[in-house]
Curated annotation (Swiss-Prot):
EC number per UniProt: 6.3.5.2
A single MF term (Gene Ontology): GMP synthase activity
UniProt gene name: guaA
Keywords linked to the UniProt accession: ATP-binding, Glutamine amidotransferase, GMP biosynthesis, Ligase, Nucleotide-binding, Purine biosynthesis
Active site: 85 (nucleophile), 179, 181
Chain sites annotated for binding ATP: 233-239
UniProt name for this protein: GMP synthase [glutamine-hydrolyzing]
Complexes and interactors: Homodimer.
Record's catalysed reaction(s): XMP + L-glutamine + ATP + H2O = GMP + L-glutamate + AMP + diphosphate + 2 H(+)
Gene Ontology cellular component terms for the protein in this record: cytosol
Pfam families, alphabetized: GATase (PF00117), GMP_synt_C (PF00958), NAD_synthase (PF02540)
Pathway annotation: Purine metabolism; GMP biosynthesis; GMP from XMP (L-Gln route): step 1/1
Naturally occurring in which organism (per UniProt): Histophilus somni (strain 2336)
């Protein structure tokens, strides 16, 4: 079996908003990498034994006292090191160079003129004018290197940054002031490939097939002949987790699907058909709509609704788990960004982002071991694994659906009537987006039930019914988003269908709020 962790890159995070992008780009090249906080120790790096190290960008200034620095071992480990933006500046400072706060900051597009030859820029060239090779790059920096460390040479410059790239070829130390990980840097992926494959000598073994083989082997080694329980939601992460476990241990996997009444139209039946009938998984379906709706009565505050939904899920899951007396392990669809956000970092620092609405809060007395086969994977990698395992692309590429489901898309108190109306309206919206070839052009689309009534006219009579808001956004990272400029005729068709086909809806509106200031979800 291929050792997919034999060659690996360590990325030290100095706080850049792009750091996870670096990791994803390295993985796309076909090489395993991990992202750690910048202040890891020499002992931790030795234990990880990286084939190469990348120092990320960051918001701090190297000219400030007590600004972050890499441990000195980074430069004594005998492996190639690539410094990006702040990573370049701290490498320069730590190796005897000098940085200063620039009077002319560079943010956005820049053109780097290549200078002395370097292995990092081998076969890179975006423009060639009068034998002057140049790169189109993306800059985001205030400080700049003004004096080279010993044995370094300038390999790139811009009109305002005389040292935009530098290298010490003998020690295989490379620095760029720009961000190769962002798509705006045209040759960025090739640059990273030069570093990871050609300079570090990494083999590209990080492929979907190898990851599946490795995950199945590790599951078998971890759980043996024991039985495992998994909360299957039908989402991407739990679905791929289920198929990996099923391939490894077969009927020793018990999936619990909790139908809480807050799912999309026919979603419960679709989950059972897909995983029970098609893939032959052992699934227990728990019809818990009444239990959830009863617990949510009278609750209209969003965070209180989230907590209630999470608590009831744990209670329902716990009740089912008690019936499976031979279960020794709990499986979860934890993915790598969850690990990063939960600060399961090598330094032990905790940065709690928000609680997850899954089985992470199971009672301590259950005493189950934890199986997390996706723990090393980014979301795009999970989708690739899912495709290789036979999951349909349309399911893997569905728009995000919140953990609390319709609980945060029905504003205010949750009632069955409201959920049923929203389910039907949302299904029409999504169906028409597919028909018009707009579904995959937007990043997320859904309906929101507004608990206000509006006067309408149907035939010769007036009616006083509910309002649905449609929301569609375009985004790269979901940190910021633009509302999608859907064609008026498409919006008109969707509105007409909802009002005519969903008895109880008299008005449809379209949300044209960006993020910020609005969030993508209404609650």
């Amino acid at each position: 079996m291929t050792n997919i962790h034999h060659h690996k890159i360590l990325i030290l995070d100095f706080g850049s908003q792009y750091t996870q992008l670096i990791a994803r780009r390295v993985r796309e090249i076909g090489v395993y990498c991990e992202l750690w906080a910048w202040d890891v120790t020499e002992e931790q790096i030795r234990e990880f034994n990286p084939t190469g190290i990348i120092l990320s960008g960051g918001p701090e200034s190297t000219t400030e006292a007590n600004s972050p620095r890499a441990t000195e071992y980074v430069f004594n480990a005998g492996v190639p090191v690539l410094g990006i933006c702040y990573g370049m500046q701290t490498m320069a400072m730590q190796l005897g160079g000098l940085t200063e706060t620039s009077t002319h900051r560079e943010f956005g597009y820049a053109e780097v003129s290549l200078q002395n030859p370097t292995a990092l820029f081998a076969d890179l060239n975006d423009d060639l004018t009068a034998c002057d090779p140049k790169l189109d790059v993306w800059m985001s920096h205030g400080d700049k290197v003004t004096r080279l460390p010993d044995n370094f040479q300038i390999t790139g410059m811009t009109s305002t940054c005389p040292i935009a790239a530098m290298s010490d070829e003998s020690r295989r130390f490379y620095c760029v002031q720009f961000h190769p990980e962002v798509t705006h840097t045209k040759c960025g992926q090739k640059l990273l490939q030069n570093f990871v494959v050609d300079i570090c000598g990494c083999e590209t073994n990080w492929t979907a097939e190898n990851i599946i083989e490795d995950a199945v082997a590790r599951i078998k080694a971890q759980v043996g002949d024991d039985e495992v329980i998994l909360g299957l939601s039908g989402g991407v992460d739990s679905s791929v987790t289920a198929l990996l476990l099923h391939r490894a241990i077969g009927k020793n996997l018990h999936c619990v699907f909790v139908d809480n009444g807050l799912l999309r139209l026919n979603e419960g039946d679709q989950v059972m058909e897909m995983f029970g009938d098609k893939f032959g998984l052992n699934i227990i379906r728990v019809e818990a709509e009444d239990r959830f709706l009863e617990a949510l009565k009278g609750i209209d505050e969003p965070e209180a609704k989230r907590k209630t939904i999470g608590k009831v899920f744990v209670d329902v899951f716990d009740d089912e788990a008690k019936k499976l007396t031979d279960v020794k392990w709990l499986a979860q669809g934890t993915i790598y960004p969850d690990v990063i956000e939960s600060a399961a970092s090598k330094t032990g620092k905790a940065h709690v982002i928000k609680s997850h609405h899954n089985v992470g809060g199971l009672p301590d007395y259950m005493k189950l071991g934890l199986v997390e086969p996706l723990r090393e994977l980014f979301k795009d990698e999970v989708r690739k694994i899912g495709l290789a395992l036979g999951l349909p692309a349309e399911m893997l590429n569905r728009h995000p659906f919140p953990g609390p489901g319709l609980g945060v898309r029905v504003l205010g108190e949750i009632k069955k009537e409201y959920c049923d109306l929203l389910r039907k309206a949302d299904a029409i919206f999504i169906e028409e987006l597919h028909k018009a070839d707009w579904y995959y052009k937007v990043s997320q689309a859904f309906g929101v039930f507004l608990p206000v009534k509006s006067v309408g006219v149907m035939g010769d009579g007036r009616k006083y019914d509910w309002v649905i808001s449609l929301r569609a956004v375009e985004t790269i990272d979901f940190m910021t988003a633009h509302w999608a400029n859907l064609p008026y005729d498409l919006l008109g068709k969707i509105s007409n269908r909802i009002i005519n086909e969903v008895n109880g809806i008299s008005r449809v509106v379209y949300d044209i709020s960006g993020k910020p200031p609005a969030t993508i979800e209404w609650e």
